[in-house]
């Protein structure tokens, strides 16, 4: 089913890892760190440049604004930078490991051209794939899949995932024809946007994913073993 494609573009949550990972692990880790991060911020702190881009001087208001963005799951590029900074600390300390599906790990390792497209920042994507829970090893062991991935795209590099132009931008950047690419995601709006430039699409149907109305109009993949 996937042998006709030379290039694969993958979404992350709900596609290569459980959709719950972001909301039940990454978001809570971030929101727990925000108060201390904001209150202890100084002009020479590493995160000061990111926080200053919100243009909110009052620390209480800034903290409330950041937490509101998270609660509403707003795809704000400044928020994504800040999340990447905080999550880096979690990954590097061993507190966070990404539960990438075993079939997705195998898929990424065996396919020649694999690219990632997520609303999370490129930095956050590289962290996630750099600290993957090894399904065949003790809990403290992790895998680094970044060497198997050919490139990363986010809303800053390419645009919103629900806009067709974003996929045209990606095709340009990877130097591929639309007919050569298969895009896999759990979001039908993203699939429709990619199809708008002729990219083949597949709906990822993983445990915990929300039901998709008219899901029968998409090629459905419950795992990547058939690709």
Swiss-Prot record:
| GO annotation, cellular component aspect | cytoplasm; nucleus
The molecular function terms of the Gene Ontology recorded here are: acireductone synthase activity; magnesium ion binding
| Compartment(s) | Cytoplasm; Nucleus
Q: How is the cofactor bound?
A: Binds 1 Mg(2+) ion per subunit.
Question: What pathway is this protein a component of?
Answer: Amino-acid biosynthesis; L-methionine biosynthesis via salvage pathway; L-methionine from S-methyl-5-thio-alpha-D-ribose 1-phosphate: step 3/6; Amino-acid biosynthesis; L-methionine biosynthesis via salvage pathway; L-methionine from S-methyl-5-thio-alpha-D-ribose 1-phosphate: step 4/6
**Which top EC class is given?**
hydrolase
- The catalytic activity of this protein is classed by the Enzyme Commission as 3.1.3.77
Q: In the UniProt record, does the keyword Amino-acid biosynthesis occur?
A: yes
What is the catalytic activity of this protein? 5-methylsulfanyl-2,3-dioxopentyl phosphate + H2O = 1,2-dihydroxy-5-(methylsulfanyl)pent-1-en-3-one + phosphate
User: Which positions bind substrate?
Assistant: 118-119, 161
Q: Name one GO biological process term.
A: L-methionine salvage from methylthioadenosine
Q: In this record, what's one Pfam family?
A: Hydrolase
Q: What does this protein do?
A: Bifunctional enzyme that catalyzes the enolization of 2,3-diketo-5-methylthiopentyl-1-phosphate (DK-MTP-1-P) into the intermediate 2-hydroxy-3-keto-5-methylthiopentenyl-1-phosphate (HK-MTPenyl-1-P), which is then dephosphorylated to form the acireductone 1,2-dihydroxy-3-keto-5-methylthiopentene (DHK-MTPene).
Family note = Belongs to the HAD-like hydrolase superfamily. MasA/MtnC family.
Name of the protein in its database record: Enolase-phosphatase E1
Task: Supply the source organism for this entry.
Answer: Saccharomyces cerevisiae (strain RM11-1a)
């Amino acid at each position: 089913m996937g042998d006709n494609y030379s290039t694969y573009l993958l979404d992350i949550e709900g596609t290569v890892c459980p959709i719950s990972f972001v909301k039940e692990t990454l978001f809570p880790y971030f929101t727990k760190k925000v108060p201390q991060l904001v209150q202890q911020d100084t002009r020479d702190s590493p995160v000061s440049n990111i926080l200053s881009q919100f243009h909110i001087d009052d620390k209480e208001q800034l903290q409330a604004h950041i937490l509101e963005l998270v609660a509403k799951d707003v795809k704000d590029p400044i928020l994504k930078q800040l999340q990447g900074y905080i999550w880096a600390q979690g990954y590097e300390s061993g507190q966070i490991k990404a539960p990438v599906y075993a079939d997705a790990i195998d898929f990424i390792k065996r396919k020649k051209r694999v690219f990632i497209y997520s609303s999370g920042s490129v930095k956050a994507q590289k962290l996630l794939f750099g600290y993957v829970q090894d399904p065949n090893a003790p809990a403290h062991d992790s895998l680094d899949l970044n060497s198997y991935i050919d490139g990363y795209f986010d809303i800053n590099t390419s645009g919103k995932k629900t806009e067709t132009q974003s996929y045209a931008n990606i095709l340009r950047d990877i130097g591929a024809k639309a007919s050569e690419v298969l895009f896999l995601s759990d979001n039908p709006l993203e699939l429709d946007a990619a199809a708008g430039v002729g990219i083949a699409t597949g709906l990822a149907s993983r445990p915990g994913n929300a039901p998709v109305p008219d899901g029968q109009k998409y090629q459905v993949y419950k795992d990547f073993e058939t690709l």
